UniProtKB/Swiss-Prot annotation:
Family: Belongs to the protein kinase superfamily. Ser/Thr protein kinase family.
Enzyme's top EC category: transferase
Intervals holding HEAT repeats: 441-478, 485-525, 556-594, 596-633, 635-672
Name of the molecule in the record: non-specific serine/threonine protein kinase
Protein kinase domain residues: 27-299
Topological relation to the membrane, as annotated: Lipid-anchor
Amino acid sequence: MGGQLSLLAQTAPSIGIFSYIDILDETHYVSQLNNSRFLKTCKALDPNGEIVVKVFIKPKEDSSLEKIIQRLKREAVLLSALPNVLNYSKIFESTRCGYLVRQHLKTNLYDRLSTRPYFTEIETKFVVFQLLQALKDIHDLDVIHGDIKTENLLLTSWDWVVLSDFCSNIKPAYIPDDNPGEFSFYFDTSKRRACYLAPEKFDSAKASGDGVHQATKEMDIFSLGCCIAELYLDGAALFNLSQLFKYKSGDYTLNDILPQTISKSSPVLKDILQDMLQVDPKKRLSAHELLEKYRTIYFPDTFYDFLYDYCKTLVTLGTSVPCADQIEVNTTLQDHLGSIDEILIKIYCDFGRICKSLKLPVLDQEDMNYNTKDSFLRVSDKLLRLENYETDKITASIQNEVSLIILVFLCKEFRNLQFPENKVKALQLILAFSLFVLDDTKLDRTLPYLVAALEDDSTRVKVMAMNCVTTLIKEVKHPNQLNENIFVDYLLPRVQALLQNGQEESLVRVAIASNLSDLALKANLFQEYCHTMQSSTIPNIVHDFESIEVIRKYSRKLQQLFEDLTVSILTDPEISVKVALLKNILPLCKYFGREKTNDVILSHLITYLNDRDPALRMYLVECISGIAILLGPITMEQYILPLIIQTITDEEELVVVSVLKNLKDLLKTRFVNKKYFYDITKFLSPLILHPNSWIRNFVLTTLVECINQMSKAEVYCVLYPVLRPFFDFDVDFTGDMLISCAKLPVSRNTYNLLRSWNNRSKKTFFWQRVTTNYVDAFGNSTINFVDKRYVKENYGLKTMKVESNIHLHTNENENIPLTLEDKFWIDKFKNSGLTDNELWKIVALREYVVRSSRSSSKKPETVTSIVSKLSLTPSNFSIENVMPNTVFFDIEFLHPETLTFNDLDVTNTNSIKESESNTFTDNHSKVIEMKGSLIFKTPRIPTTLSNLKNIYVQLEPTNNHSEGHAHLSARNQPANFIVKSSYEGQDKIIEKYLKQLNILPSLKEYKEFGFVSENTTAEADVINLHGKFVRSYPQIFDGTLLQSEVLLGTKSFMIYGSDQGALTVWDIDRLANEKSITRPLYYECSAEITCIKGLSGYDSFCVGLKSSEILIFRISLSKNGKAKNLQELICIRSLNLIGENSSEYPIQIECCPNNDQFQLVVLSNYSNVYLFDIRTMKVIEKLELNADYGCTISMVLDDKNNLLFFGTVSGIIEMWDARYFVQIRAWTFGESLPINKLAIMEQENKSLLVVCGGVDSAFFTLWNIEKLSCKHVFVRSNEQPSLDSFNVIDADKLDKLAFEKNNSNIKPIVQIFNNKVLYMDDIGRLLHILDTRNPEKSSTFAGSKVELHSFSVLQVTASLTMSLQKHNYQKEVNNSNYTSSRVMTVNVFQLKNKPYMLLTDEEGYINIYT
């Protein structure tokens, strides 16, 4: 602020400095950062976060700082757009002080130099580059900093440099060279005695002169050179004040000041400092010149071409920028919660470009020219090869470590990410960039952040972090001695804690199990490498012995940690966790060694063979052969080989296949002693007859391996007698010959029948076994079955003559006695196709079947297998004699609804069915039947039938009813009922389960909907309409009729709805009768009626309102003699559709009868589809259609209620499965015009889709739903349109959808009757009746004339037919009363076999034609 003012400044405030801060609005004092005599610097808080407030206390209260403040504000405006500058955001004065306010950053360069992790070489270069670039940017704006020092160079958490505390306008440009107090007063605020000022700044003449002097850019260059030198001197200042004066006078040179280490390690750096620290300002290079001169020489090209600009983009992304001529912007942390996620997504999407710019070798996923045996890391759309760093490109990338700049940003900002999916992407990026840094950097800079991610709340993040930790550790080739015990002291304890805390997260435990072996192998390599390095550097023998003892201690601790983790995983209750460990267990066995593997691993693996899950047994068998080779022949013979042979009898055939395959591999390695070949052959040879071809082929190939390792004499003396019965004739023992000459296997039915016989046999000799103490070579007890001799000796049959037909003769001339039950089973085999000569095959398979059955019964049932496989039952529990108990439900209504129909409604025995379940036997029912209704004046007390356990529905009290407004009380008050079950048992679990079932009556049992009608009135044959006017009715209520519906119930009704909410119901019989006039029923709704839909078979219908309501009405009839008259319109249900959008309302309703249910499908104006149960008016399903396809305006449900079709304004037709609410297909055609109407037409027992819209040249198109192809087109003219207009175009393949091509609010009216389409054009004048079967019979009504048209039918393709319209002649009809106004609705009905047509026009008239 000038020398004159500053010399008068108070050296200490008269009151506490905090009092100057607290008087500011929304600012709270925190602490004082320095106690400079010139400017007091404090940290404070405001709504935007932490701020720094610099306070200048005025020497006099009348002192004005206005001119200085104006200069500071102009400077701040210039600097506000630079991302590497932190300008003052608030500059103002009070009567006592001047204030400078800026954002607070925690770290400056001076503090960062003493903080771990220290800068690497590439980071130091990038910081220097940023400093020069920032200085260039401010100098380009003609802004001078004036006081560059390490305290004013701020750094973010990821080392982005920011210049702050510009002081060229508040501190003197020159100070006296004979007054050190001036230097301390202005520039030595930190009291470090370090001097960063340029030598020329010390000029007594200019400092004491009256002229205005400004600081120069060269001064900033010198100051920045001192900061750069300090950066390489590990925080030691280059000059103090006395040294600077000596340097200025020439007593010191730069070579004397710079240490020799800098000159030797980086001679280029010395050149840079010389160009910046010249005593003569004119010899100093500018920031721009320095950047250009040392490009490639010192700074990599990547800094210039990509890295700096990309980092600057990351800094500015999602941040707020002040408006023009503003120096501040108000923003809070809440405003930037998602900004880091946006930056992360950008880096992830730009990964390929980043790697290309940083010259990191990556592969595209489409590139198939890589070795598939290599491991790859997939990030975004790129692949990184793992464990293959031999190429020069990869080595250069690692040595350069340029990827560390992006890596540091990702690591520092990982904790600020909000969404788990973005954290997963960040972990992938961290791992990818870590592949291109040095090993020490991997362990010191990356690993801590990956390990910290193991404590994240998201399971996905934990799993990805565990995989990334393992991959990163595997990529480390040369660890240093500091990281020797990283597994014991750091990594494994955290993995152990993750395993213990993740008991409910099976995916986390799976990730640990799958990576444990790799970690164990790498931990062993770490120790071996570090021991080797240590032994070569320690010559002291005593110290060597001490080191060996420490090494052994850590080795034992490391092994114990891995042992604990392994046991926890091996005993985990989840099968998937065990399987994950088995897939990669060999490295873990190698780490433990033979003894530990036997004790820790093998003892647990043996128990897996008794597990119910076949996948676990199969994976165990696949890995057991490798473990056998690792553990040696003794373990192989004593433990593993017997287990393998035992598992051949597994009940799961895939497990058996896996066993045989691994046994063959073991034989091929000659790891099995020949003394076991006989027992193996004897055990396997019956499986040649097994119906599974895989088992059969693997058995034969296994036998070939045994034969190949034996001499010919051994084969014929030992194996030949065992194998001969299973081959048709003597053959050479080769694989091809054995397979081609083996006996045919038994069929699958025969094999299943044999197993069933074994399981169900009771009185049998065939399956009777003889007790023996003999065991085979594998320790398995042999199975001996009874024979004829044994039966005679032990069953008293020595002297008895036994019939020969109760013996089974085998190929070995062995007679097997049979009981009558056995004889019955043998007859079954013969009936299944097994001949007498083939019965020996079931004898050969008998032992294997018994062993496999015993193996199945030995496996205990686990909780997992009980839940996942309910069909498996424990062997000690039998349901063979337990009969199923079928439970029936019965629904009984408590009382009829307030509105009953006995007296009011007309009953016709031919057309109405009453539900039998609505009858009652108590006294109340008699009163109800006599009087018609029973109204309780006071509510009844809720009752629960506690004495009957099979009646469990609470009886709710009825509401008070008003006799005068009975129709209002009926709304949303369905009849109360109880549900009875036929279960009379005492099992609490079954009772609880039955109570949880949602049992509702069928719709026909709800009396408020009226009686079920069997009205089978046929649809009108509109082709017989002649256009003769019958009569006309004026609309007696306000509004224009917009909606209409014909309802076929006990009678035929015509329902109209207006835009004013007027709902009218007409009796069609009286409406078409010229001799009688009837007054319609009227109901005034609260808003415009948007849609009407009748409930087929009921005197009820649905109405949709623009006020978001859906109302269900019942038409009540009265009886006047034999006549049935309209009496009342009753609202029985209502529902408000308002959800997230208050302006949502229904635009179309479809009915979906589903067995005893009746569901409503409602389409809203927000393209949402709701499925309601009409009985409860509850939402069953909500479907949000694809907004990219445009607003949905039409809908239709097929006749079988299986398919839903939707049409949009952009011409898209969506086909959905109505049962599962899954989209099947979305397509468009033609010009993609709006789909105004969709309908279903039955033709030749096939459902066709009628589409009105999509193409302008046709009235409508017919589509084959099965083939999804256009079948028939009714063209508006006699010109054939292009075939391309009717090709199916997949909606997802469209680049841009056509929205609002047809802006007309007037839509054509389309009605479907049998095979005819009634089409009213969009101007409401011409009415077309188009016959899809006989196009020549189509006609058009227009005023008093009937235009007859013929259609020429063209078979364009094998599947497409076009009907081209041709105008023939006009026929005059006495039709003077034909409406001249625009037609609003068209309906057709049939009365006494005569068709009628009702037209409503915009003037409100209902016109009837025949």
